[in-house]
Amino acid sequence: MQNIFDEVNSLDKRCRDKFDLSEDIMMENASISMFDYIQNNFEPKTKILIVSGTGNNGADGIALARLLHTLYNVSLYIPFGVKSPMAILQLQRAQKLNIKIIQKIKKYDIVVDCLFGSGLSRDLNKDTISLIKKLNSLQAFKIACDVPSGINTLGQVTTNAFYADFTITMGALKKSLFTDIAKEYVGKIEVANLGIQRKIYETKSKSYLLEKDDLKLPIRDNKIANKGTYGHLSVIIGEKKGAGLLCAEAGFSFGCGLISVVSHELQNIPNSMMQNSTIPLNTSALCIGMGLGKEYDEQLLLNDLPKVIDADLFYDTKILALLDKKNVVLTPHPKEFCSLLKMTQIADISIEELQNNRFEYLQLFCKKYKNIVLLLKGTNVLIGYKKKIYVNILGTSILSKGGSGDVLAGLIGALLAQGYTPIKSAICGSLSHTLAASNYKKNNYSMSPLDLIQEIKKL
């Protein structure tokens, strides 16, 4: 996993103060990183437009133009002039090389957005909005320097933003790149080296980007095991029976030794599963909430089993009694999380407000309920525990179907049953869920929850 930071100004200052890396040195390395990407991916003489703003992000772009000059057909567009000392200096250098500075945008193969960096904290004016619309309309490969222009420090887009195919962010990953809203704009992300290795540039962080290598599959390596060795997951079946059965199927596909469905009514269940009217005594983890409905036996909640809580329970105040327990994983989608925030008196907010501040509200919840692991579903999944947040950006629109969340609950429940910690269960369950969906080879609109389970078996 990689560190994610709220801001990097303090990291830049640390480099200047501790390692004597001047602003000029770091800027040169930033522009070299962008140059290397272009040189490694595009043929010489490709037509490139660099659009530079008034500050240091614009200065990065002007420095890039200097490096590309003569090797590529590069044009520099500076619509609002230059203001920062570094931008003025870089422009003076570019002018001495007679780099082409244009007044009108034409056709290009590559457009590099260097208008604003990660420090944008205001709304865009009309001229900037119009310019970004123009840039977005160009049929070109689009690269963003640091952060696509229009995305502010909180990862919000108040008017419009530059649609990048590739973002080269400076020094370290920023939280603003990983909001659900930002995902539409950032494309693929690469971190630019600013003159020292990232492990030296960076300090400790409380937010982390999950990667494929962070997935630890429940591989069986015990040669004298039996079915009880790998846990017993019980799934509570409610009014919408299909949801619970999908959860149970997913749990069985992910290494769990025994699966029981708990219901007072006879269910048509696979032969591999057991049915009980009460939670079996040897249960090692519990999944509850999927399709549960309003009428259920409250006694099912009154235990200290590790559990995954989903769906309908986020609208029921009985969930409050579980929030001080250990070994509990909550898996709400945004609407359900808004309900939970209201019930816990943390905030009474709209879904829109939540989506604009997902990190903030997850942190508030985890600060109040320190024993709980909360997985907030979304385009980018956020997993919060104590003071840390883990971000899974590997999800795709393939998962935007009913039943996908039931499968996720079963995966997490299966890992809990096998002895994984709640945070490891949430991380590995989420990664397996998204990676399995990414591996689906047919049309992205056709995957069913059962297809997803089949892909999980292939991981």
Residue ranges and their predicted role:
Residues 1-71, 75, 177-306, 315-329, ...:
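Small-residue (G/A/S/T)-rich helix-start motifs and N-terminal tracts that mark the onset
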Residues 35-114, 123-145:
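Nucleotide and nucleotide-moiety/phosphate-recognizing core
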Residues 80, 105, 171, 193-195, ...:
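Residues at the C-termini of beta-strands that transition into short coil/loop
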Residues 94-101, 125, 148-153, 214-219, ...:
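Short gly/ser/thr-rich secondary-structure transition/capping motifs
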Residues 104, 109-123, 289-296, 381:
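Glycine-rich phosphate-binding loop
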Residues 105-109, 161, 280-281, 323:
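A short, aliphatic-rich alpha-helical micro-motif
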Residues 110, 115-204:
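Internal gly/pro-rich beta-alpha loop/helix module
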Residues 112, 145, 309-311, 332, ...:
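Active-site flanking residues adjacent to catalytic metal/cofactor-binding acidic residues
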